[in-house]
Amino acid sequence: DSKEHGGVGCRTRKQFLFDDVKEQFEKIMGKKITKWRETYSICGVFQYGTAGIPKVYHVDAQQYAAMVFLTPNAPYQAGTKIVANKKNGIYHSSQGNPLEYFPQQETFTDGTLFEDVDVFGNVYNRCVIFDGKAIHTAGDYFGHDINSGRLWQMFFFDAE
């Protein structure tokens, strides 16, 4: 069961948070999670995207994002990227007004405005935790359905 949302692809309505996920994130990061599933309704949902879906360049409202890549043998370039604006070098929302690097709605999908800072390859069952306030996007989408496309579980949270 998936729903319409602000992202691309299909996303589950239900949150799937397995035992000790929050505690494991806290242990890995050495921080206490202060806002989790109760605050962020998309924490713990599954999502997939397929070839032809545009990449969306964005920052999150949440402090941290995490994703677990769930497609076996996926192309490595189909992971997630932290990017910087080519014109002004901004790669994090703390460096200026987000409207300076997203001046018009159509620039959210215009990859020519950005260059890669960090690339997290799509490795099956790998969890990547990153600063949600950094400008980021998916790598390449691939496949034609949930069985052959880019599948991941995502988490959003704040911590101190």
Give residue ranges: language-model regions.
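Catalytic core of non-heme Fe(II) oxygenases with the double-stranded beta-helix
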Residues: 49-160
